[in-house]
Amino acid sequence: MRGFYIGRYQPFHNGHRHMVEEIAAEVDELVLGIGSAGDSHTTRNPFTAGERVMMVTKAVEKLDVTTYVVPIEDLDRNSVWVSHVQSMTPRFDIAYSNNPLVVRLFEEAGVEARGSPMFRRDVLEGAELRERMIHGRDWQALVPETVVDVIEEIDGVERIRRIAETDANGTAPSDA
């Protein structure tokens, strides 16, 4: 059986890893969708799809399950979102998500969907990690070591700090 789990992974953290480990115990193969693949260089989405593919691939490489990491660009039409996802990924039998809308969309499309309890959601949340990076607080203990390596390789902390100096959309203020 092949499962599917989507996330923005901005960055991939230990909560994601915990969820992936739980799913891996239930499936033979796992498709990990990199959501919002077209977004990068903003405070909400500082990392590119390619950088997130590196993070996720390295973080799950030792799991005993065949894993496919697939970037998926946003589609602002919920009624056809599941078919968009299916067109971008290997076929899967079951979708996993903790997002009620995502679960509902898969169920309406006839795909079995399962949730999982959040793992340490109080600190294992992307916005919290990005804030810690911006303010120089410890974030490394909350992500797999391989993710720390990728973020250091791309100078990701400096990037997000620079982005945070601009406006809320991650774009430079206009001169007007």
From Swiss-Prot:
Catalyzed reaction equations: beta-nicotinamide D-ribonucleotide + ATP + H(+) = diphosphate + NAD(+)
What protein name does the entry list?
Nicotinamide-nucleotide adenylyltransferase
Q: Which GO terms describe its biological process?
A: NAD biosynthetic process
Give any Gene Ontology cellular component.
cytoplasm
The UniProt GO MF terms for this protein read: ATP binding; nicotinamide-nucleotide adenylyltransferase activity
Family statement drawn from the similarity comment of this UniProt entry: Belongs to the archaeal NMN adenylyltransferase family.
Q: Does the keyword Hydrolase apply?
A: no
User: Known EC number(s)?
Assistant: 2.7.7.1
The scientific name of the source species is Halorubrum lacusprofundi (strain ATCC 49239 / DSM 5036 / JCM 8891 / ACAM 34)
Q: Pathway listed for it?
A: Cofactor biosynthesis; NAD(+) biosynthesis; NAD(+) from nicotinamide D-ribonucleotide: step 1/1
Coiled-coil blocks = none
* Cell location: Cytoplasm
List the keywords (alphabetical).
ATP-binding, Cytoplasm, NAD, Nucleotide-binding, Nucleotidyltransferase, Pyridine nucleotide biosynthesis, Transferase
Domain of life of the native organism: Archaea
The family database entries (Gene3D superfamilies) matched by this protein are listed as:
HUPs
One Pfam family here: CTP_transf_like
Instruction: Please name the top-level EC class of this enzyme.
Output: transferase
